[in-house]
């Protein structure tokens, strides 16, 4: 990112502390992104509405409100419907990518996270 370019804000909705910590480390090294976090779908919805991040990374298997339902609610809300969402799943099954896209996600990636691949997806989503 060029000098003086704005830092992009990402919301990572993830209940696994290790996954959150690792992603935070990766993005800290880049210095291009500020990471907001939520531990469940309900908190993710609230933080997205209040903070208006540039992009949301949404784990699909969350407590309380899962990532599928959180995505539906975010896309149905005029205040958050335009925020790109990349779905993440550790238990990716056949058809999950298609289901995530049909739910309103802009992209899908499986865990374990391959940082370069995820970064390319983030940059592509932010460019559109």
What does each model-identified segment do?
Residues 63, 81, 93, 112:
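The feature encodes the CheY-like receiver
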Residues 14, 39:
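Conserved acidic carboxylate
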Residues 59, 89:
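Active-site residues of response regulator receiver
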Residues 17-36:
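Two-component/phosphorelay signaling modules centered on CheY-like receiver
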Residues 112-122:
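C-terminal output helix
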């Amino acid at each position: 990112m060029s000098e003086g370019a704005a830092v992009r804000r990402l919301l990572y909705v993830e209940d696994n502390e290790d996954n959150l910590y690792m992603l935070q480390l990766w993005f800290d090294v880049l210095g291009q992104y500020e990471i907001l976090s939520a531990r469940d779908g309900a908190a993710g919805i609230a933080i997205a509405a209040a903070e208006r991040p540039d992009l949301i990374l949404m784990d699909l298997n969350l407590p309380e409100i899962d990532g599928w339902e959180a995505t539906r609610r975010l896309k149905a809300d005029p205040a958050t419907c335009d925020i790109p969402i990349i779905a993440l799943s550790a238990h990716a099954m056949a058809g999950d990518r298609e289901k995530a896209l049909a739910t309103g996600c802009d992209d899908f990636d499986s865990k374990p996270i391959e940082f370069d691949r995820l970064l390319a997806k983030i940059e592509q989503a932010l460019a559109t």
